[in-house]
A protein has these predicted regions:
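Residues that define the transmembrane beta-barrel architecture of outer-membrane proteins
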Residues: 22, 37-41, 75-81, 114-120, ...
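Residues on the lipid-exposed face of transmembrane beta-strands in outer-membrane beta-barrel proteins
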Residues: 43-47, 83-89, 120-126, 139, ...
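Outer-membrane beta-barrel transmembrane domain signature
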Residues: 144-210
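Gram-negative (and chloroplast) outer-membrane scaffold detector with strong preference
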Residues: 82-141
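Short glycine/proline- and aromatic-enriched beta-strand/turn motifs that initiate or cap beta-hairpins
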Residues: 22-66
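Short loop/turn motifs that connect adjacent beta-strands in outer-membrane beta-barrel proteins
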Residues: 20-23, 51-53, 88-99, 127-135, ...
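Transmembrane beta-strands of outer-membrane beta-barrel pores
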Residues: 28-34, 60-64, 102-110, 126, ...
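Cleavable N-terminal export/targeting peptides
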Residues: 1-23
Length: 210
């Protein structure tokens, strides 16, 4: 999964497909993390319709050489995907900012799988009058195949701020995920530790030169 310290180098395409209600883009990102330092290609799509919205992204990490110290082949070493559906049949009611949410996560790397996960819950949208600035908050039940979880939940925030500080074309967006999953980590001296929670965030700053 994408992590903090990723720099968006290039947005390859922005393809509106339905009167600004849908968009697809490709991003090339370089991760400056001390244990990472590789390129990720992200394919992303968001589409609204009368019943809600659909979102997915696929990350391709070009880190084969990082996973195999005996190889200098800078090729695909891992793929991760998320796809989610928000359902909202009550857009004309006082509950219009609330939606039902269903999501799938999973992936594979050269050395290990990223176990399938299913998420179900609710999301709440906060926005200004123009929808240029939005904040989406999710509370989700999360079950991860063959993984121990003290609490089967995930909390997610996704934000977008357009024309930041009044600068036209300057955008600040990103996400933050927090969930419970028992996993091993390694400290600076190589000692393994067991942790029970995961926090991932990826803020991005964009400037549209078009």
């Amino acid at each position: 999964m994408k992590k903090l310290k990723s720099l968006a180098l290039m947005a390859l395409a922005l393809l509106p497909t339905s009167k600004a209600l849908a968009q697809t883009n490709a991003q090339v990102l370089y991760d400056f993390g001390t244990d990472r330092k590789y390129v990720t290609l992200t394919l992303e799509m968001f589409k609204q319709d009368k019943w809600g919205s659909t979102y997915f992204f696929v990350d391709h990490d070009f880190n084969y050489d990082k996973m195999d110290p005996n190889s200098d082949n800078v090729s695909l070493g891992g793929t991760y995907t998320e796809i989610s559906r928000a359902l909202n049949f009550w857009k004309d009611s006082s509950l219009k900012n609330w939606s039902l949410h269903a999501e799938y996560n999973g992936g594979i790397t050269k050395n290990y799988p990223i176990n399938n996960a299913w998420l179900f819950g609710v999301e709440y949208l906060i926005h200004d009058a123009t929808y240029k600035n939005t904040l989406n908050l999710d509370v989700l039940y999360k079950t991860i195949r063959k993984k121990d979880q003290n609490v089967p939940m995930q909390l997610t925030a996704v934000w977008t701020c357009n024309d930041l500080f009044g600068v036209k074309g300057l955008k600040f967006d990103g996400f933050a995920d927090f969930w419970w999953e028992t996993h091993a980590t390694f400290d600076g001296d190589g000692q393994a530790k067991t942790r029970h929670t995961v926090f991932i965030t990826e803020p991005q700053l964009w400037y549209n030169v078009g």
